[in-house]
Amino acid sequence: MRMFAATLLGAALMFVSSSPARADGDAIAGKAAFEAQCSVCHTAVAGKNGFGPSLAGVVGRKSGTLAGYSYSQAMANAGLTWDAKNLDEFIASSANKVPGTAMQVAVADPEARANVIAYLGTLGTAPAVPAADTSTAAQAPLEPSTQGPSADELLHAGTDTQGWLYASKDYTGQRYVDLAQITPANAGQLRAQCIYRSNNAGATQTSPLVYQGTMYLTIDKAIVAIDATTCRERWTYNWDAKGAVLSATNRGVALAQGRVLRGTADGYLIAVDMAKGNLLWSRKIADAKDSQYLSMPPLVVGDLVIYGPAGADWGAKNWIGAFKLASGEPVWRFNLVPDANEPGADSWTNPSARDHGGGSLWTPLALDAAKGVLYVPVGNPAPDFYREVRPGSNLYTDSVVALEVKTGKLLWYKQFRANDMHDWDLSQVSPLINATIAGKSRELLTVSGKDGLLRMMDRATQDVLYEIPITTRTNVDAEPSIDGQHICPGLLGGMEWNGPAYSPAAKTLYVGTVDWCGTFTKTAEPPAYAQNAHYYGGAVTPDPRAQARGWLYAIDPATGKQRWRQPWPTPLVAGITASKGGVLFTGDLDNNFLAIDANTGRTLYRFNTGGSVGGGVLSYAIKGKQYVAATSGVVSGFFGGTGTSAVVVFALP
C-alpha cells in the first residue's frame, strides 16, 4: 500500500545493510516500538485489519493467507512462512525479501527487529472468515437467510442517511446525502479509516452499495461484502464463468429482500444471499455468441429486477428486460433495436443492419416511482464508425426511452443522435429534479452523454429546455474518413459511466466530465460482422493520454447557467456525491480521493489512494458518524490507471 507514509516499524528508516536479529529480543520494548510506529497501519487484534493486515498470530503463518485481508500480488505469491528468520529478513529490507511488495520497510538495527519479533510472538491468532459457497449449480431458487432492503426502503433510499442502495444512490439518481458532519470548515481533517484491497488488476468501475453497516461491491468475477467502517471482509462469492467472455468490466450490484444481484461477464444474472454469500439462483440471459455481456448495475423495483446487456461495439442487438426477483424468471422484454414487426424498425432502411445494430446498456437507469416510468439511456449503433451500412435514424440508439416499468410498454422516446457515426453513447438519464422555472413547477430529466452535451428535459412534455456543452466540442459534424478526422470529443469524451449529482439544498447540479479528443478513421470497405470480434468499421486514435483533461461544473438546473467551473488535470469519470454539509466527494485519475467545496469548487482535501479513482464514491452514516468511501484501481485499458481494485473509507477523527 504505497500511499501510506508509515508502515511496519516506519518506512523512513532506510539503510543499506543490516545484521541478523538477536535471538533474545525484548517483547516489552517491541510492544512499545509496535505501538509507536507499526500501529499506524497494523493492529495487534485478531480479526481486525488496518491499512495493513492484523499481525496477531503472524509468527508461523503463511504469507499472504490471512482471511479477510487482500494482499498485493507479490505478497500473495511469496510462499513464505513467517518464522523469526523470515520476519527478520523482511523487516530488514522488505524490497529485497519480497520484490514488488507494497510494504516499504528497512530497519538496520538488529536489536530493534528482534524486539518487535519477540512481541509479535506473544500475540494470538486471527479468526478465519467463513468461506462462501461458490457453487454455481443451484437447481431451484433458494430463499435468502435474511430480509431487506424492502421495497419501501428502496423507494425512500434518497432520504436514507445510513445506506447507499443504488449505484446512483436512489431511483432519481441525485447522488445526494442529507449529512452535514463533514463541512468545508473541517473537510481538511478527513482521515483514511481503512482500506480493502484485492489482487485484481482489472478494471475497477464498480459502484459499492451500503446496507445496515455492510458494503457490497463487485470485483472482476466476485461479489464482496465488507464492513463499511473497518473494511473487514465478511464474505466473497466467486462466479466461475461457464462460457466465453467479451469484457469483464462490471459496475456494481443491486440489493433487495435479502439478495445481492449482479450480471456476469458470460451473460448470467445471479442472486447471492446477503448474509452468507451463497448462490440463490442464476439465469442465463445473454450470450457472447450474440456479442453480448453484462456490465450495468441492476435496478430492483418491487419484485422485478431490471437489466440488459452491453456489446454494441461487437455487434450485439440489445434489449432491456425485467426478471422476477425470487427466481430470475423473465417477465418482459423491450428491444432497443426493434424486430421487423415492431415500431421503429423502419428507422433501419437496411433491415439486415438491425441484426447487429447495437444499443448497449452500461450505465444506471432512473425511475419516477410515483408514475411508474423507467428511463433508459441507450448507447451507440453498430458498426460504430461506418454508418453507410445502417442508413436511417437507427432507433432506439442514442435515445432516452421511457417505459412503463411493470410491463415494459413504450411510453415515449427522444433520440439525440440519429445515425450516430462517432460512438457517442447517450450515457446518463439522471438526476431527476423538480424545479420551478419562470414560476412554473417542472419535473426535469437530466440527459448527458459522450457527445459532451448536457440537456435538461421536461419529463411531462419531453421538451428540451436547454442544451449546453460540458467539454470541448470541435469538428463535431465531420465524418470519420480513411485519412482521419480530428474531432472533439473523441471516443472517450463527455460523460461516461457515472452521472451528475444534484443538491436540493443548494439547488445545484454538479457535473464531472472528460475532455479528450481523437482522430476518427473508417475502413475503406464496409465491415463484415464476425462473432466475438469488434464491429467498428473504423477506429479512433485518442490524443496522447497526457493531453486528456477534465472539467468539474456547478450548474443551475433551471437555466443551465454555470455557477462555477474548474478545469482538471485528468479526466473525471468517478462518481460525485453532493452533501448537505456543502462538500462534494469525488476522485480523479491521478489516484486522488477529493473533497471539494460545493460553493466554490475549491479542493479542501485530497488523499492518494494508490490507484486511479474511477468507480463509485459514496457517503453514509453509521452510529452517528459520517463516512465516505471511494473505489480505486485500474480504470480501463483506455483510461489506464494504477493499483489493484480497492475501497478506501474516510471519516473525521
What are these regions (language model features)?
Residues A138-S198, R232-A241, N278-D287, E329-V337, ...:
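Aromatic (tryptophan-biased) beta-strands that constitute blades/sheets of beta-rich domains
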Residues V272, K276-G277, N318-P330, S393-K409, ...:
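Beta-propeller blade signature
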Residues A12-R22:
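C-terminal segment of classical bacterial N-terminal signal peptides
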